[in-house]
Amino acid sequence: MTSSPLAVEPPTRRAVVFIAGGGTGGHLMPALAIAEELRRKRPDLEPVLLGAQRGLEATLLPQRTFRYHLLPLEPIYRRQWWKNFRWPLIALNVRRELIRLFETEQPVAVIGTGGYASGPCVWFAARRGIPTAIQEQNAFPGIATRQLSRMVRHVYLGLPEARARLKLGRETQVFDTGNPIIP
Protein backbone atom coordinates (compact mmCIF):
# COMPACT_ATOMS: atom_id res chain seq x y z
CA MET A 1 0.00 0.00 0.00
CA THR A 2 1.39 3.41 -0.91
CA SER A 3 0.69 6.55 0.99
CA SER A 4 -1.19 9.43 -0.51
CA PRO A 5 0.89 12.46 -1.49
CA LEU A 6 -1.48 14.47 0.69
CA ALA A 7 -0.89 12.31 3.76
CA VAL A 8 0.51 14.29 6.63
CA GLU A 9 3.26 12.79 8.74
CA PRO A 10 2.36 12.70 12.41
CA PRO A 11 4.35 15.26 14.37
CA THR A 12 7.45 13.77 15.93
CA ARG A 13 7.70 14.15 19.66
CA ARG A 14 10.80 15.92 20.86
CA ALA A 15 12.84 14.22 23.56
CA VAL A 16 12.04 15.65 26.99
CA VAL A 17 14.64 16.90 29.46
CA PHE A 18 13.36 17.58 32.96
CA ILE A 19 14.90 20.58 34.72
CA ALA A 20 14.03 20.38 38.41
CA GLY A 21 14.55 23.12 40.94
CA GLY A 22 13.02 26.03 42.68
CA GLY A 23 11.65 27.19 45.96
CA THR A 24 13.66 30.39 45.63
CA GLY A 25 14.86 32.53 42.75
CA GLY A 26 18.41 31.33 43.39
CA HIS A 27 17.37 27.87 42.20
CA LEU A 28 14.62 28.79 39.74
CA MET A 29 16.48 31.40 37.67
CA PRO A 30 19.35 29.03 36.77
CA ALA A 31 16.74 26.42 35.80
CA LEU A 32 15.09 28.94 33.47
CA ALA A 33 18.46 29.98 32.02
CA ILE A 34 19.35 26.34 31.30
CA ALA A 35 15.92 25.75 29.75
CA GLU A 36 16.29 28.83 27.51
CA GLU A 37 19.76 27.77 26.35
CA LEU A 38 18.66 24.18 25.79
CA ARG A 39 15.73 25.38 23.70
CA ARG A 40 18.03 27.66 21.68
CA LYS A 41 20.88 25.20 21.07
CA ARG A 42 18.99 21.90 20.93
CA PRO A 43 15.62 22.29 19.19
CA ASP A 44 15.36 18.48 19.17
CA LEU A 45 14.96 18.56 22.97
CA GLU A 46 12.05 19.94 24.96
CA PRO A 47 12.87 21.35 28.39
CA VAL A 48 10.09 20.66 30.89
CA LEU A 49 10.43 22.35 34.28
CA LEU A 50 9.61 20.60 37.56
CA GLY A 51 9.04 22.60 40.71
CA ALA A 52 7.09 22.74 43.94
CA GLN A 53 3.52 23.92 44.35
CA ARG A 54 4.63 26.11 47.26
CA GLY A 55 7.72 27.63 45.65
CA LEU A 56 8.32 30.80 43.67
CA GLU A 57 7.91 28.70 40.53
CA ALA A 58 4.16 28.41 41.17
CA THR A 59 3.95 32.15 40.44
CA LEU A 60 6.63 32.56 37.75
CA LEU A 61 6.28 29.46 35.56
CA PRO A 62 2.72 30.20 34.36
CA GLN A 63 4.13 33.42 32.87
CA ARG A 64 6.73 31.52 30.81
CA THR A 65 6.40 29.54 27.59
CA PHE A 66 7.81 26.29 28.99
CA ARG A 67 5.74 23.30 29.93
CA TYR A 68 5.99 22.60 33.65
CA HIS A 69 4.73 20.40 36.45
CA LEU A 70 4.41 21.43 40.09
CA LEU A 71 4.86 18.74 42.73
CA PRO A 72 3.19 18.61 46.18
CA LEU A 73 6.47 19.25 48.00
CA GLU A 74 7.43 21.14 51.12
CA PRO A 75 10.88 22.18 52.29
CA ILE A 76 12.77 20.35 55.01
CA TYR A 77 12.18 22.55 58.03
CA ARG A 78 15.19 23.34 60.17
CA ARG A 79 13.73 25.64 62.83
CA GLN A 80 10.21 24.16 62.92
CA TRP A 81 11.49 20.59 62.83
CA TRP A 82 8.18 19.08 64.00
CA LYS A 83 6.67 19.93 60.60
CA ASN A 84 8.99 17.31 59.09
CA PHE A 85 6.83 14.54 60.58
CA ARG A 86 4.59 15.02 57.51
CA TRP A 87 7.42 14.05 55.18
CA PRO A 88 6.59 10.33 54.87
CA LEU A 89 3.16 11.23 53.49
CA ILE A 90 4.62 13.99 51.30
CA ALA A 91 7.25 11.58 49.96
CA LEU A 92 4.59 8.99 49.12
CA ASN A 93 2.51 11.55 47.20
CA VAL A 94 5.56 12.89 45.37
CA ARG A 95 6.68 9.38 44.45
CA ARG A 96 3.26 8.64 42.94
CA GLU A 97 3.37 11.86 40.96
CA LEU A 98 6.94 11.21 39.75
CA ILE A 99 6.01 7.70 38.59
CA ARG A 100 3.15 9.20 36.57
CA LEU A 101 5.32 12.00 35.13
CA PHE A 102 8.23 9.76 34.20
CA GLU A 103 5.89 7.26 32.51
CA THR A 104 4.02 9.89 30.49
CA GLU A 105 6.92 12.24 29.65
CA GLN A 106 9.73 9.65 29.37
CA PRO A 107 12.58 12.11 29.97
CA VAL A 108 15.95 11.35 28.39
CA ALA A 109 17.80 13.33 31.10
CA VAL A 110 17.13 15.18 34.35
CA ILE A 111 19.00 18.30 35.51
CA GLY A 112 18.65 19.56 39.07
CA THR A 113 19.34 23.15 40.08
CA GLY A 114 18.80 22.80 43.81
CA GLY A 115 15.92 23.50 46.10
CA TYR A 116 13.42 21.06 47.46
CA ALA A 117 12.00 20.06 44.07
CA SER A 118 15.42 19.09 42.78
CA GLY A 119 16.26 16.33 45.24
CA PRO A 120 13.38 13.88 44.70
CA CYS A 121 13.37 14.36 40.91
CA VAL A 122 17.10 13.79 40.41
CA TRP A 123 17.15 10.89 42.87
CA PHE A 124 14.18 9.25 41.12
CA ALA A 125 15.87 9.58 37.71
CA ALA A 126 19.25 8.32 38.93
CA ARG A 127 17.64 5.23 40.47
CA ARG A 128 16.11 4.44 37.07
CA GLY A 129 19.36 4.86 35.14
CA ILE A 130 18.29 8.08 33.43
CA PRO A 131 21.24 10.44 32.83
CA THR A 132 21.37 13.06 35.58
CA ALA A 133 23.21 16.29 36.29
CA ILE A 134 23.26 18.94 39.00
CA GLN A 135 24.03 22.62 38.59
CA GLU A 136 25.20 24.15 41.89
CA GLN A 137 25.24 27.94 42.16
CA ASN A 138 26.85 28.36 45.58
CA ALA A 139 30.30 28.00 47.13
CA PHE A 140 28.66 25.94 49.88
CA PRO A 141 26.42 23.36 48.18
CA GLY A 142 22.90 22.85 49.45
CA ILE A 143 21.48 19.66 50.94
CA ALA A 144 20.18 18.29 47.63
CA THR A 145 23.52 18.76 45.86
CA ARG A 146 25.56 17.31 48.71
CA GLN A 147 23.36 14.22 48.89
CA LEU A 148 22.97 13.66 45.15
CA SER A 149 26.55 14.36 44.05
CA ARG A 150 27.38 10.71 44.76
CA MET A 151 24.84 9.37 42.28
CA VAL A 152 24.69 11.83 39.36
CA ARG A 153 26.75 11.66 36.18
CA HIS A 154 27.68 15.34 36.02
CA VAL A 155 28.02 18.21 38.48
CA TYR A 156 28.28 21.73 37.05
CA LEU A 157 29.69 24.23 39.53
CA GLY A 158 29.07 27.94 39.55
CA LEU A 159 32.01 28.40 41.92
CA PRO A 160 34.99 26.01 41.92
CA GLU A 161 35.41 26.04 45.72
CA ALA A 162 32.18 24.04 46.02
CA ARG A 163 34.04 20.95 44.79
CA ALA A 164 35.82 20.51 48.15
CA ARG A 165 32.46 20.12 49.91
CA LEU A 166 31.11 17.35 47.68
CA LYS A 167 31.42 13.60 48.06
CA LEU A 168 31.44 12.41 44.48
CA GLY A 169 30.59 9.06 42.98
CA ARG A 170 33.35 7.08 41.26
CA GLU A 171 32.09 8.03 37.81
CA THR A 172 30.79 11.53 38.55
CA GLN A 173 32.37 14.19 36.38
CA VAL A 174 32.69 17.75 37.70
CA PHE A 175 32.83 20.86 35.52
CA ASP A 176 33.55 24.45 36.59
CA THR A 177 31.17 26.33 34.32
CA GLY A 178 30.07 29.42 36.21
CA ASN A 179 26.44 30.16 36.89
CA PRO A 180 23.83 30.24 34.12
CA ILE A 181 22.08 33.57 33.81
CA ILE A 182 19.20 34.93 31.81
CA PRO A 183 20.44 37.88 29.72
What are the functions of these language-model segments?
Residues 23-25, 115-117, 139-140:
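Residue-level detector of alpha-helix initiation sites
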Residues 14-24, 44-93, 97, 172-180:
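Conserved nucleotide-sugar phosphate-binding/catalytic loop shared by glycosyltransferases and other
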Residues 126-183:
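Active-site-proximal region of nucleotide-activated glycan assembly enzymes
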